[in-house]
């Protein structure tokens, strides 16, 4: 059970993740067997907006060609548990950015982004890899 998550881009940028969703699906035949290759792999994130004038995510979103590599690290408070779960992505575009602020709530300003990656890897050292054909 993850208690914290961080979105990291190399050694330069890091954001605290509040929500993370991703999904992969396969088409199926009438009998329930797979009928094609898996698709999907969009990563939907809600991160705490930085307090400074950080425009890293905005710059990424505004570019139709800028690709980033990064990772989402899910950690637990109990250090006795195994190493954290890591989702790595490569050659990714930011295809959606939405910011939310409400002065009447105690919730910090949030940034929602959707990432479309050519490759998503899971497991120890990326032992399971999902590849999108972005030709």
What are these regions (language model features)?
Residues 1-135:
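Glycine-rich, low-complexity intrinsically disordered segments
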């Amino acid at each position: 059970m993850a208690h914290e998550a961080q979105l990291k881009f190399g050694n330069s940028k890091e954001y605290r993740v509040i929500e993370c969703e991703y999904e992969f699906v396969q088409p199926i035949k009438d009998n329930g067997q797979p009928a094609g290759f898996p698709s999907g792999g969009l990563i939907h994130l809600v991160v705490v907006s930085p307090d400074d004038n950080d425009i890293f995510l905005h710059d990424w979103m505004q570019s139709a060609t800028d690709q980033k590599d990064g990772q989402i690290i899910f950690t637990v408070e109990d250090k006795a548990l195994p190493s954290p779960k890591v989702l790595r992505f490569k050659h990714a575009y930011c295809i959606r950015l939405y910011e939310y602020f409400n002065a009447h709530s105690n919730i910090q300003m949030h940034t929602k982004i959707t990432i479309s990656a050519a490759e998503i890897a899971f497991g120890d050292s990326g032992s399971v890899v999902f590849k999108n054909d972005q030709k």
